Amino acid sequence: MMGYQTNSNFSMFFSSENDDQNHHNYDPYNNFSSSTSVDCTLSLGTPSTRLDDHHRFSSANSNNISGDFYIHGGNAKTSSYKKGGVAHSLPRRCASCDTTSTPLWRNGPKGPKSLCNACGIRFKKEERRATARNLTISGGGSSAAEVPVENSYNGGGNYYSHHHHHYASSSPSWAHQNTQRVPYFSPVPEMEYPYVDNVTASSFMSWN
């Protein structure tokens, strides 16, 4: 029994001695470095990790954009992206001829800058003609005979209102002469010479 205990004690002592030797020879840094290599920057949030995160975020955005570009058939104009917070607007069209190119946009019946240059000029002309017709109808019409004409003889005024007076004042003197009785020869010899009243006797009977 004693020999067994001695052997057991010896074995226990030997094992404990080996444990102490292993404990003194244990280096946690060497064992940790030999088992695996760990980058300490992953847990500290250093610039290198932030740069990696930014690179991954940029890669994800580029993949999404390329996917959307593929879905829209490669047509960048039909995409619904917003630049600067403003969506792409449709090109302006003329309300009359549906053109999209013009040197100048003009106001029309549908609002400001709703007509192209040519349609805007035509619309303005028609608007002026309609306004002139309305003024003519409301004013009872106008004619050239009603327009006053400057009379150089009377120093102004309406020519038609003073025309009769001007004609009377500028007529020749023989028009105001009294009628005179002028004898003429009768075909019957026994009859007396009759007399006729003639205003213009002095002009065409100068032989008398």
Swiss-Prot record:
One GO cellular component from the entry? nucleus
- Location of the protein in the cell: Nucleus
Main location class: nucleus
The family database entries (InterPro entries) matched by this protein are listed as:
Znf_GATA (IPR000679), Znf_NHR/GATA (IPR013088)
Q: Where are the zinc fingers (GATA-type)?
A: 94-119
MF (Gene Ontology): DNA-binding transcription factor activity; transcription cis-regulatory region binding; zinc ion binding
Tell me any Pfam family this protein matches.
GATA
Task: Report the SMART domains cross-referenced here.
Answer: ZnF_GATA
Keyword terms:
DNA-binding, Metal-binding, Nucleus, Transcription, Transcription regulation, Zinc, Zinc-finger
Span of the signal peptide: none
Role: Transcriptional regulator that specifically binds 5'-GATA-3' or 5'-GAT-3' motifs within gene promoters.
Q: Write out the similarity annotation.
A: Belongs to the type IV zinc-finger family. Class B subfamily.
Q: What is the name attached to this protein's record?
A: GATA transcription factor 20
According to its UniProt entry, this protein's organism is: Arabidopsis thaliana (Mouse-ear cress)
